[in-house]
């Protein structure tokens, strides 16, 4: 089950109390104080685990507390430190206290101290003085710290697929990656984001994210709305997946409506580098003309992707991807326009190389 938002309570451990004791040995009637210090309370850490991509493990487990420190012992023995609490989260997890962002956990294997445990109390050996040889007092341990926090997950991927419901995003990600999403011929088959690793060759791979289909008004929460748009905020490149076979809504209108929703949600998201995939091209007549017209619509001075072996359909790349073009392309310009068919795997092999080249 995919979960991307939970509220939990975290607490560090209480420090252990110091010990009140006196040295007792044979022939020693009144030994001095030898009470040990209490152990410090356990700390709370967040640790980023690259092997998980959901917060589902937190469902039903609201309280996450470190252990208390052990009491001090006799003969100046210090108490054991309380066991730390390690809270494992997926990359891209943000920790909020109220509405304020507290921690942003991105790097795999990163471990961040969230709460420090309470300090252990001092034993009575610390309170011996010239005027008080037999102190009967020891400190209590300090209390730990408790916080109510909200965990929000924003998936981290290199490529983010954006499109209307039933555009073929899930079929595409299942064709070129190791992801196995549910696929069916009706809208909103995909109800949660899917992540897939795309292997290009023995040395190169990248991570692709497929989010549920966007509808008009998604930026205001319609459909699956804002709850999933946030998952493409961290992607490096967006790939608009357009259904070239739709008769009721042309590819230009699809693109314009999708971009409008992104701009309403986040201007920074709308300004990310992007490319366009014209899916279901195997059932469209004169797909080459459609692709050329769409390039003209985008003001894209493009060239055929002969280097990537695209057959039998044309593909178009921004010159930035096919040469040592030193100047970065305009952020509003498409990096590629590529007809393909996810179902029949037409041009999907070449797509891997195109996407790899598009990554900064």
Swiss-Prot record:
Keywords: Cytoplasm, GTP-binding, Hydrolase, Magnesium, Metal-binding, Nucleotide-binding. It holds the Pfam family MMR_HSR1. Its main location: cytoplasm. Its EC number is 3.6.5.-. One of its GO terms (biological process) is ribosome biogenesis. Its cofactor is Mg(2+). SUPFAM superfamilies: Obg GTP-binding protein N-terminal domain (SSF82051), P-loop containing nucleoside triphosphate hydrolases (SSF52540). GTP binds at residues 163-170, 188-192, 210-213, 279-282, 341-343. It is an enzyme of class 3 (hydrolase). Residues 157-360 form the OBG-type G domain. InterPro entries: G_OBG, GTP-bd, GTP-bd_Obg/CgtA, GTP1-OBG_CS, GTP1_OBG_dom, GTP1_OBG_dom_sf, OBG_GTPase, P-loop_NTPase. One of its GO terms (cellular component) is cytoplasm. One of its GO terms (molecular function) is magnesium ion binding. It is found in: Cytoplasm. The keyword Nucleotide-binding applies. Mg(2+) binds at residues 170, 190. Coiled coil: none annotated. Residues 1-156 form the Obg domain. Belongs to the TRAFAC class OBG-HflX-like GTPase superfamily. OBG GTPase family. Monomer. An essential GTPase which binds GTP, GDP and possibly (p)ppGpp with moderate affinity, with high nucleotide exchange rates and a fairly low GTP hydrolysis rate. Plays a role in control of the cell cycle, stress response, ribosome biogenesis and in those bacteria that undergo differentiation, in morphogenesis control. This is GTPase Obg. It comes from Helicobacter pylori (strain HPAG1). The gene is obg.
